[in-house]
């Protein structure tokens, strides 16, 4: 299978602060089916999503592979993630329209290239954008899930302390973007309430960022995260970008 990995240049106007809604679909694919799954998604279903973008039913979409996909074959863990970006909740509520014209877009019965039989949807999460930096080209993403004790304090520090720090470091050491989302649904005692993301141009830069000691101590000394989120990130995941689609007006 030919390599379909692409760099994506994302602009701030792709996601309007405080407005856009993000839906994340997590899939598990057995290791012996990953090549087939990725081929079908890129060759066929990317056309369906592009048509939805062209028709105004979707702003943007990204297709990711989890770093250990195909290496650790745990059926309870995601191997891939689809990110769908909607203008607002109204557009999200009409998301079924994305797939309604699949047959017309493809020109044949879409069930013949379906991926449901070779993958399992483990969960779907919806978020609302709080803030982010203008994004640059990236190849890897780190998603940080948290359930802070003080959500308002957590968000305020991210915007007032960490965002300026990250902005200053855009383009340095492979760093390419940052953002923060609030969980909309599902919600619960065992669910993260917020997600932050970091983007990187290389695997090495992403791995360096995951290192426990790789923090600017001048920033850490000003942080009150030990109060806002005493337990730290509940989970962190490293993903590789396969494809990004979307245009901005």
Annotate the PLM regions.
Residues 1-21:
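Bacterial Sec-dependent N-terminal signal peptides
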Residues 18-103, 112-249:
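Short S/T/G/P-rich N-terminal loop/turn motif that feeds into the first structured element of a domain
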């Amino acid at each position: 299978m030919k390599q379909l990995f692409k760099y994506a240049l994302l602009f701030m106007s792709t996601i309007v602060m405080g407005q856009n809604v993000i839906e994340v679909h997590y899939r598990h694919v057995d290791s012996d089916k990953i090549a087939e799954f990725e081929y079908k998604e890129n060759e066929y279903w990317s056309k369906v999503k592009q048509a939805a973008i062209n028709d105004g039913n979707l702003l943007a979409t990204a297709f990711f592979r989890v770093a250990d996909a195909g290496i650790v074959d745990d059926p309870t863990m995601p191997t891939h993630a689809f990110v769908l970006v909607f203008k607002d909740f109204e557009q999200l509520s009409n998301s079924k329209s994305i797939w309604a014209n699949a047959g017309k877009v493809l020109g044949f019965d879409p069930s013949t290239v379906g991926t449901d039989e070779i993958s399992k949807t483990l969960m779907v999460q919806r978020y609302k954008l709080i803030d982010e930096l203008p994004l640059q080209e990236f190849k890897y993403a780190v998603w940080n899930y948290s359930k802070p004790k003080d959500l308002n304090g957590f968000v305020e520090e991210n915007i007032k302390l960490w965002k300026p720090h990250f902005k200053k470091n855009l383009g340095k050491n492979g760093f390419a973007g940052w953002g923060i989302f609030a969980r909309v649904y599902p919600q619960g005692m065992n669910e993260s309430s917020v997600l932050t993301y970091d983007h990187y141009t290389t695997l090495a830069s992403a791995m360096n960022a995951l290192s426990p000691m790789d923090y600017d101590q001048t920033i850490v000394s000003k942080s009150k995260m030990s109060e806002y989120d005493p337990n730290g990130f509940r989970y962190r995941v490293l993903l590789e970008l396969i494809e990004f689609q979307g245009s901005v007006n």
